[in-house]
A protein has these predicted regions:
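C-terminal active-site/capping subdomain that shapes the small-molecule cofactor and substrate pocket
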Residues: 228-314
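Structural alpha-beta junctions
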Residues: 52-54, 205-212, 263-272
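Short helix-capping/linker segments at secondary-structure and domain boundaries
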Residues: 18, 146-155, 207-208, 297-310
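Short acidic loop-to-helix transition motifs that present clustered carboxylates
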Residues: 59-66, 218-221, 279-282
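Short, small/acidic-rich helices and loops at N termini and domain boundaries
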Residues: 309-325
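Conserved beta-strand scaffold positions in the cores of enzyme catalytic domains, especially
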Residues: 55-57, 122-124, 211-213, 242-244, ...
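Active-site phosphate/pyrophosphate-binding segments
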Residues: 2-5, 11, 22-23, 29-30, ...
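Glycine-rich phosphate-binding loops that contact phosphosugars or nucleotide phosphates
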Residues: 22-166, 177-178, 247-252, 259-267
Length: 325
């Protein structure tokens, strides 16, 4: 259950991934991670944690439109917690047809079978029957193992000790109450875009409510003007409630922009919640925030009387897609 997943989140970083067919895995400096939904969140976070890493996150059919030479210089990592994601299986088949170096991350399903059949390196995640969005720690450890980043794995392992999920529940419950009967809009710096996106999808999937996200400074040049409300447009935006993810490590100019935005929004009658990203390290800071997001989304679901675990609309959509073939 999702409650247990949140409470034991730190234990995911005790995970020691086993790479099967490891003899076929070479060392790469460039990567493409193909995954949908919760299965690409670990790669997103990895980009935020180590911006210098050359990694393309691809959430679509096939592969990114790169030249053949460029693709052959990258390890293509196919990530699907269920192992049955249509787009990721298509990416596997595309990579196989083009004879590209690849590896697989999945808990079970067709993707594992394909990896075994084709002798492709793979990590089979432990199946705790959790939603993919709740297995980001496991996916991160598996991704780092395939990349051969042992130093980063060792740093991530410290989260098993430093993360204290239960300590964040009270804050999450309070934030859910403040955000009740509104649509959260999460803003962060561009370098923390992955954190803002995680907050958004947790509100969507766990909380079962609309939520949106964007980044500074880009939104200062467009989206922000949509909230310069007038009498005739007030009804369109009165349900939005802003969540600013502030990071002391951000560029001082970004910090200034967020402070000015906070004033502008409050002057126009909008509610703004400010969350300061804190932690003993960059990765600790990221996951501290994500656990707070989990608790907030969980208690949001409770306030609305919805199931925080399942995603019935996604499952219904998949069935309809399959029926149309």
């Amino acid at each position: 259950m999702i409650l247990d997943d949140i409470k034991s989140y730190n234990k995911q970083f005790e995970y020691e991934p086993l790479v099967e067919n490891v003899g076929k895995l070479k060392k790469f400096k460039k990567f493409v991670v193909c995954g949908m939904g919760g299965s690409h969140l670990a790669a997103d976070i990895l980009k935020a944690w180590h911006p210098e890493l050359d990694i393309i996150v691809w959430s679509n059919y096939g592969l990114p439109p790169l030249g053949e030479k460029e693709l052959k210089e990258r390890l293509v990592i196919l990530s699907s917690y269920s192992g049955g994601t249509e787009e990721t299986i298509d990416a596997f088949n595309t990579a196989k047809a083009r004879r590209l170096p690849m590896a697989v991350i999945a808990a079970h399903g067709k993707l594992i079978s394909l990896a075994e059949k084709n002798k492709v390196p793979y990590v089979q995640l432990p199946d705790f029957h959790q939603q993919p969005r709740m297995a980001t720690g496991l996916s991160l450890m598996a991704t780092l193992a395939l990349m051969g980043e042992r130093t980063w794995m060792a740093e991530a392992k410290t989260l098993a000790i430093h993360l204290r999920p239960s300590r964040e529940e009270h804050r999450g419950k309070d934030l859910a109450k403040h955000l009740h009967d509104s649509v959260p809009v999460i803003y962060a710096s561009a370098r923390n875009a992955a954190i803002a996106y995680n907050w958004k999808i947790k509100f969507n999937e766990t909380g079962k409510i609309p939520a949106f996200q964007n980044v500074v400074p880009e939104l200062n040049h467009n989206e922000m003007t949509g909230f310069d409300t007038k009498t005739k447009t007030h009804s369109l935006s009165r349900h939005f409630h802003f969540v600013f993810l502030k990071d002391g490590a951000d560029d001082p100019r970004i910090i200034k922009r967020m402070s000015v935005m906070e004033k502008l929004f409050k002057d126009r009658g909008f509610k703004v919640e400010v969350i300061f990203l804190q932690g003993k390290s960059e990765i600790h800071k990221i996951f501290n925030s994500l656990i707070l997001a989990d608790w907030t989304a969980f208690h949001t679901a409770k306030l609305y009387g919805t199931d925080p675990q399942e995603v019935p609309m996604v499952e219904e959509f998949k069935k309809l897609i399959a029926r149309e073939r």
